[in-house]
Amino acid sequence: MPRVKRGVTARARHKKVLALAKGFRGRRGNVFRIAKEAVMKAGQYAYRDRRTKKRVFRQLWIARINAASRSFGMTYSQFANGLKKAGIEIDRKVLSDMAIHDSAAFGAIVEQVKAKLAA
């Protein structure tokens, strides 16, 4: 069985890890042993935060809808309840965008909701 020299694969592996650690501060970006740990930790943060991002955006959308609905004289919870009763199935992302960029349309939806809640 021939002897296997690992120089080529080791260099490739080191290059790959150091490329992933590009832009890291200090030795985390240029020393393989430390960069390897930093890249692994960065991957863990990325995995965790891809899930956290969904929660954060939902919170943002709700805060925006709440602010816009309060300017029309109702709270977010009242507005959400009214949407359900009125049978309006627009998601929070679209409602949030509408509240910012098209307040007239959002106002029309609020009026529909108020009418349904009053009835």
Curated annotation (Swiss-Prot):
Keyword Ribonucleoprotein attached: yes
GO molecular function, a single term: rRNA binding
SUPFAM superfamilies cross-referenced by the UniProt entry: Ribosomal protein L20
Keywords, sorted A to Z: Ribonucleoprotein, Ribosomal protein, RNA-binding, rRNA-binding
A Pfam family recorded for this sequence: Ribosomal_L20
CDD domains in the cross-refs: Ribosomal_L20
Keyword Protein biosynthesis carried by entry: no
PROSITE patterns linked to this entry: RIBOSOMAL_L20
InterPro entries per record: Ribosomal_bL20, RIBOSOMAL_L20_CS, Ribosomal_protein_bL20_C
One CC-aspect GO term: ribonucleoprotein complex
Gene Ontology biological-process entries: ribosomal large subunit assembly; translation
Physiological role: Binds directly to 23S ribosomal RNA and is necessary for the in vitro assembly process of the 50S ribosomal subunit. It is not involved in the protein synthesizing functions of that subunit.
Record family assignment: Belongs to the bacterial ribosomal protein bL20 family.
Protein name: Large ribosomal subunit protein bL20
Taxonomic source organism: Polaromonas sp. (strain JS666 / ATCC BAA-500)
